Amino acid sequence: MDKITPETEALREAYEALNRNDIQGFMKIFAPDIERIEPPGFPMAGTYHGLEAVKEHVSQGRGTWAEGACEPERFIVADDKVVVLLHVRVRRKDHTDWIDGRLGDVYTFRDGKAIQFRTFAEPQEALEWVGVEDSRED
């Protein structure tokens, strides 16, 4: 489950790029037919198809940050999927309060590229969606 693979390394690099506002660097992991799913209740909820739509979505979302980061805490590989458990701590440009929480992103890979990028409001939801249990004791 927790292991280093080419996909987990690519994701680690992608989040590093996102945190320094390098959108093009973040986009390197995606296949041309990428599908982005952001859940209801999130500021930019919806489904986005293709590189340009996903790039615009990510650029708009990242553009709201005044400061902060999305820090991967764990990468869990399950067949063609990688669950990324994240600690998100950001302050948006239009707020003084910090957003601080944990969520789960799930990436589905084909031929070394992500074909789907789905976010879950709760890490456990991401794990359940791919059918794995979090066996780590916190």
Label each region the model flagged.
Residues M1-A10, K55-D138:
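A beta-strand edge to alpha-helix "cap/lid" segment located at domain peripheries
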